[in-house]
């Protein structure tokens, strides 16, 4: 048994990885800021100790896992080096873990967390699968055959991994604080493709993914019969979305997903492709798909009277459009009200017009002040620049949250990657519900 200390344990990936090592029988603790972060709930439920940052946390015989947000000058990292302990970055450590399994990386600008959550749930319907999801959820199952994990492209972190398979959901320009342009993003994915050992499953309608070159087969999925695996006869029902799946032009089977929206069918196709390639039992896969309950902060719903309140991590224009589409398809007779908190000044500046276009698909839009990050907490841009581009949009905060009560037959979408949940909870408090998210 090894004693691990995680520097930045409340980070979504770090939290997941700490849980995995705990489940596998190791002694685990970590440190982070004292502010509440939703990822700490799962850590505390497993009895994993969370400490405030302090050099004295670091003891002899520990292995220290260094979170990506923390430099080598951090007091705990400095102490670890003074004690001559092994200090391993999150990416390198995860790369070592996955080599023990048949591994499936899920990467892409959008849809990583939802697809990884679905993949881990569905594969566990037939084979033991350990998993690491970007919503702070992780589980290490002893004697697992497979390992499903989220692989982030930011700062090219995913180049630390050499997975057996990679699901590539899409390539899009994001993280403008690091990537120069879409070509820079493509180059990162192209390099990652050469790390894959068995096969790549990629969305067929993505023009950039169609240009990817690899040393292994690339299987494209989508809605066209020119794709290697595709869905047809899609029907929206009160139980979710039903569809037929074809592989290489031949009917494979009929599936039902409890979710709504084209993007959820695409996620399911990617997962079904992995199951098909690994020859998993299709009956078990179908049953598992029908019971998928979603992942944290991805269209999580609470219903109060005729109002449906949704918590969603959407923080990029394409993700906002997908979330609004899901609301329209699932609740076609309700208004859609978007409450959005932009995340980072650089992203808001880079996609200002795209944010305005995607948010305008809602019936009414409310915007919060821009949420900064550890690396970037100021900027010349203000939220008024975005408000001015959306007809009827207005600023909202905890003092004005009552305005949402007038939409008594609506889906209210709280979207963002910052602390938008504070606003949600303030609204739920006013409605007499606490701690829903």
From Swiss-Prot:
Reactions mediated catalytically: UDP-N-acetyl-alpha-D-muramate + L-alanine + ATP = UDP-N-acetyl-alpha-D-muramoyl-L-alanine + ADP + phosphate + H(+)
A GO term, aspect molecular function: UDP-N-acetylmuramate-L-alanine ligase activity
Keyword list, A-Z: ATP-binding, Cell cycle, Cell division, Cell shape, Cell wall biogenesis/degradation, Cytoplasm, Ligase, Nucleotide-binding, Peptidoglycan synthesis
InterPro entries the UniProt entry points to: Mur-like_cat_sf, Mur_ligase_C, Mur_ligase_C_dom_sf, Mur_ligase_cen, Mur_ligase_N, MurCDEF_pg_biosynth, UDP-N-AcMur_Ala_ligase_MurC
Pfam families: Mur_ligase (PF01225), Mur_ligase_C (PF02875), Mur_ligase_M (PF08245)
Location in the cell: Cytoplasm
Documented EC number(s): 6.3.2.8
Biological process (GO), any one: regulation of cell shape
Positions with a binding annotation for ATP: 108-114
Function, as annotated: Cell wall formation.
Protein family according to the UniProt entry: Belongs to the MurCDEF family.
Protein name, UniProt field: UDP-N-acetylmuramate--L-alanine ligase
Native source species: Staphylococcus aureus (strain JH9)
Gene: murC
């Amino acid at each position: 048994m090894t004693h691990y200390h995680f520097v930045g344990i409340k980070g979504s990936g770090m939290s997941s990885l700490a849980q995995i090592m705990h489940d596998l029988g190791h002694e685990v603790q970590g440190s982070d800021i004292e502010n509440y972060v939703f990822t700490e709930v799962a850590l505390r439920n497993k009895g994993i100790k969370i400490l405030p940052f302090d050099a004295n946390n670091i003891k002899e015989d520990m292995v220290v896992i260094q979170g990506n947000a923390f430099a080598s000058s951090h007091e705990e990292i400095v102490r670890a080096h003074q004690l001559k302990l092994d200090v391993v970055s999150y990416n390198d450590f995860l790369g070592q873990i996955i080599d023990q399994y048949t591994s499936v990386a899920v990467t892409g600008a959008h849809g990583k967390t939802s697809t990884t959550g679905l993949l881990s749930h569905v594969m566990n319907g037939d084979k033991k699968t350990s998993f690491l999801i970007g919503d702070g959820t992780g589980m290490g199952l002893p004697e697992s055959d497979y390992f499903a994990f989220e692989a982030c492209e930011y700062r090219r972190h995913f180049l630390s991994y050499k997975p057996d398979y990679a699901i590539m959901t899409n390539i899009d320009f994001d993280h403008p604080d690091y990537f120069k342009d879409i070509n820079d993003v493509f180059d990162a994915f192209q390099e990652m493709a050469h790390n894959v050992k068995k096969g790549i499953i990629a969305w067929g309608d993505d023009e950039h993914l169609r240009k990817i070159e690899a040393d292994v087969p690339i299987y494209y999925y989508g809605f066209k019969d020119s794709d290697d695996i595709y869905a047809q006869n899609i029907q929206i029902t009160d139980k979710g979305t039903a569809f037929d799946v074809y592989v290489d032009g031949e009917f494979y089977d009929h599936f039902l997903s409890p979710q709504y929206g084209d993007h959820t069918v695409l996620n399911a196709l990617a997962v079904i492709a992995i199951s098909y390639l690994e020859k998993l039992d299709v009956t078990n896969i179908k049953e598992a798909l029908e019971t998928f309950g979603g992942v944290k902060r991805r269209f999580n719903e609470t219903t109060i009277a005729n109002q449906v309140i949704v918590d969603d991590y959407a923080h990029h224009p394409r993700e906002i459009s997908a979330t609004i589409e899901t609301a329209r398809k699932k609740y076609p007779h309700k208004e859609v009200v978007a409450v959005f908190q932009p995340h980072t000044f650089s992203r808001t500046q880079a996609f200002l017009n795209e944010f305005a276009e995607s948010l305008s698909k809602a019936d009414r839009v409310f915007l919060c002040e821009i949420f900064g990050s550890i690396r970037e907490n100021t900027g010349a841009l203000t939220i008024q620049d975005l408000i001015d581009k959306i007809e009827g949009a207005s600023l909202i905060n905890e003092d004005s949250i009552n305005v949402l009560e007038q939409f008594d037959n609506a889906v209210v979408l709280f979207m963002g990657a910052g602390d938008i949940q504070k606003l949600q909870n303030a609204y739920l408090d006013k409605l007499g519900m606490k701690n829903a998210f």
